[in-house]
Curated annotation (Swiss-Prot):
Pfam family, one: RNase_HII
Similarity remark: Belongs to the RNase HII family.
Residues that bind a divalent metal cation: D7, E8, D105
Catalytic activities: Endonucleolytic cleavage to 5'-phosphomonoester
PANTHER family: RIBONUCLEASE, RIBONUCLEASE H2 SUBUNIT A
Names of required cofactors: Mn(2+); Mg(2+)
UniProt source species: Thermococcus sibiricus (strain DSM 12597 / MM 739)
Matches recorded under PROSITE patterns: RNASE_H_2 (PS51975)
Enzyme class, spelled out: hydrolase
Annotated localization: Cytoplasm
Function: Endonuclease that specifically degrades the RNA of RNA-DNA hybrids.
The protein, known as: Ribonuclease HII
Record's keyword terms, sorted: Cytoplasm, Endonuclease, Hydrolase, Manganese, Metal-binding, Nuclease
Length: 224
């Protein structure tokens, strides 16, 4: 039996791409992946993920990786869940070898619903198991999570070569917020690598505008 796994990396960040990866693994190879130490990418060091990336590529029967830019995300119609459903299906349909069973790391609060709507968009008819934290339960999803995470990490490293230290790209990262604020102060706009539909940017704009207004008021009072 051919087992499929699909996962994403970079759903929440304000900077950089969303990466979706899928793999197909023959059931007979699962033990080889376990022996390699393949597990949820979040539980592995960056170095270990990179080592496993190449080994996974060699061992899987098939794989497909889709990198979606901030522009792709901003142009979406509907919610992020709708966007992920559409692109999860796109990635699975792009596999040359179709799995008989697909494990999905569900992005919806309703796991079953997420699996159903993905299945409706597939060009083939596998059994679907959609669950939260599937990357920590099923080897095919763990392998896909590593491919997605390493691909996104490499994209972030390329951005750091251009823009300097941008942090992890997550809105909660102080380094990322500092980068966005300083870039906006210098250029009057945000860089092309950010998701303009994220509320984070509006909050930063409002904060900087407030600071500017306060500064202008202080200067006015000093002169008067």
């Amino acid at each position: 039996m051919k087992l499929g796994g699909i996962d994403e990396a970079g759903r929440g960040p304000v900077v950089g791409p969303l990466v979706i990866a899928a793999v197909v693994i023959d059931e007979s190879k699962i033990e080889k992946f376990e022996a390699l130490g393949v597990k949820d990418s979040k539980k592995l060091s960056p170095k270990k993920r990179e080592e496993l990336f190449e080994k996974i590529i060699e061992l899987v029967d098939d794989y497909f990786i889709l990198e979606l830019s901030p522009e792709d995300i901003d142009k979406r119609e509907g919610t992020m869940n709708d966007f992920e459903v559409e692109n999860f299906a796109k990635v699975l349909n792009s596999l040359k070898i179709k799995p008989d069973l697909v494990y999905i790391d569900a992005a919806d609060v309703n796991e079953e619903r997420f699996g159903i709507v993905v299945r409706e968009k597939l060009s083939f008819y596998p059994k679907i198991i959609a669950e939260h934290k599937a990357d920590s339960k099923y080897i095919p999803v763990a392998a896909a999570s590593i491919l997605a995470k390493v691909t996104r990490d490499k994209a972030i490293e390329r951005l750091k070569e251009i823009y300097g230290n941008i942090g992890s790209g997550y809105p909660s990262d102080p380094i990322t917020r500092k980068f966005l604020e300083e870039y906006y102060k210098e250029h009057g706009s945000f860089p092309p690598v950010v998701r303009r539909s994220w509320k984070t940017l509006k909050k930063i704009e409002e904060k900087l505008q407030k600071e500017k207004n306060q500064s202008n008021l202080l200067n006015f009072l000093k002169k008067s």
